[in-house]
């Protein structure tokens, strides 16, 4: 059996309504994406910590609908547009999609990822290419962080070079737990992972169990008092700026902090906020993203 994939690019104000209308009219599945993804105009859609995002679609959105082969895309789209009060049917493209073993196809798209000098991130259906390396077994899932994104890679490279056995580490915005797990495998103890998303916390716990990594996870209100040798936060620039005082206060005097989720063009602005508390600069850049790293000044 084959399917049809309908792709429509349109303004934010119509994206969610159109996706709902397409589902009501018989689409098998519909997703809304950033039409500017992987470009300088990409817009992350995350709320500030503890807040709901102020928008639910991107300024330039792409609606992707999977249709049964007997559905006529143009007719369906015209009906959906009429349903939401759009007089003119938006421009669209259609391609045929053959039925496949979707599990096998998805798995084939995720190969082991080498990072740094001795790290491999390995999906569960693959064998580790180098059994003597630092192996993190991690499957793509709901929580952010599998090593494929430049910001995750940057933070992992920094941790590999920075963590010393016995140091305490706080991973704030832990997502899948990948950075916390790596810190533990590098010898850190204790390691704490914090995230605002309960689903991410649960995913991180499961990933740590799979990797035999003793990491404590929780929501922000469970973040322990006290200071850490290392604090790492791979989030986004706005939350990083809002939480600068809190994150810096979690670093021991003389301890180190690494920040990512920051585009190169945002680096100076983020660094300026943290400069009140730590000596910080761009540690490394990769594919337009940066990792900022610094040391908390000693108390006097």
From Swiss-Prot:
What is any one of the record's Gene Ontology cellular component terms?
A: cytosol
Keyword entries, A-Z: Cytoplasm, Methyltransferase, S-adenosyl-L-methionine, Transferase
InterPro entries assigned: Ribosomal_L11_MeTrfase_PrmA (IPR050078), Ribosomal_PrmA_MeTrfase (IPR004498), SAM-dependent_MTases_sf (IPR029063)
> What GO biological process terms does the UniProt entry carry, in alphabetical order?
methylation
Cellular compartments annotated: Cytoplasm
Identify the enzyme class.
transferase
Q: What is this enzyme's catalytic activity, as reactions?
A: L-lysyl-[protein] + 3 S-adenosyl-L-methionine = N(6),N(6),N(6)-trimethyl-L-lysyl-[protein] + 3 S-adenosyl-L-homocysteine + 3 H(+)
| Residues reported in the UniProt entry to bind S-adenosyl-L-methionine | 152, 173, 195, 234
Please state the protein's primary subcellular location.
cytoplasm
EC numbers on record: 2.1.1.-
Superkingdom, taxonomy of origin: Bacteria
From the Swiss-Prot or TrEMBL record, what is one GO molecular function term? protein-lysine N-methyltransferase activity
Q: Which NCBIfam families match?
A: prmA (TIGR00406)
Member of which family? Belongs to the methyltransferase superfamily. PrmA family.
Any idea what job this protein has? Methylates ribosomal protein L11.
Q: PANTHER family, per this entry?
A: ELECTRON TRANSFER FLAVOPROTEIN BETA SUBUNIT LYSINE METHYLTRANSFERASE (PTHR43648:SF1)
Q: What is this protein called?
A: Ribosomal protein L11 methyltransferase
Q: Which organism is it from?
A: Burkholderia lata (strain ATCC 17760 / DSM 23089 / LMG 22485 / NCIMB 9086 / R18194 / 383)
Lineage of the native species? Bacteria, Pseudomonadati, Pseudomonadota, Betaproteobacteria, Burkholderiales
Q: What would be the name of the gene that encodes this protein?
A: prmA
């Amino acid at each position: 059996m084959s399917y049809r994939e309908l792709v429509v690019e349109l303004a934010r104000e119509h994206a969610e309504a159109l996706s709902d209308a397409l589902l009501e009219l018989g689409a098998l599945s519909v997703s809304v994406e950033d039409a500017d993804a992987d470009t300088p105009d990409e817009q992350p859609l995350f709320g500030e910590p503890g807040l709901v995002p102020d928008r639910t679609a991107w300024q330039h959105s792409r609606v992707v609908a999977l249709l049964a082969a007997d559905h006529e895309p143009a007719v369906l789209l015209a009906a959906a547009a009429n349903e939401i009060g759009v007089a003119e049917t938006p421009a669209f493209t259609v391609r045929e999609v053959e039925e496949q073993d979707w599990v096998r196809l998805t798995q084939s798209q995720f190969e082991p990822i080498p990072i740094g000098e001795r790290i491999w991130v390995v999906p569960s259906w693959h064998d580790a290419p180098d059994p003597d390396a630092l192996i993190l077994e991690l499957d793509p899932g709901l929580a952010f962080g599998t090593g494929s994104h430049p910001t995750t890679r940057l933070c992992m490279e920094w941790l590999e070079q920075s963590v010393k056995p016995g140091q305490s580490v706080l991973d704030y915005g832990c997502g899948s737990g990948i950075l916390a797990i790596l810190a533990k495998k590098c010898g850190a103890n204790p390691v704490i992972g914090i995230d605002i998303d309960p689903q991410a916390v649960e995913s991180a716990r499961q990933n740590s169990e799979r990797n035999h990594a003793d990491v404590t996870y929780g929501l922000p209100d469970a973040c322990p008092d006290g200071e850490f040798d290392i604090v790492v936060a791979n989030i986004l620039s706005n939350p990083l700026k809002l939480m600068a005082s809190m994150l810096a206060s979690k670093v021991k005097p003389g301890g180190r902090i690494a920040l990512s989720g920051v585009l190169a063009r945002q680096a100076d602005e983020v660094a300026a906020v943290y400069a009140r508390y730590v000596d910080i600069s761009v540690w490394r850049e990769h594919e337009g993203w940066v990792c900022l790293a610094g040391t908390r000044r000693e108390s006097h």
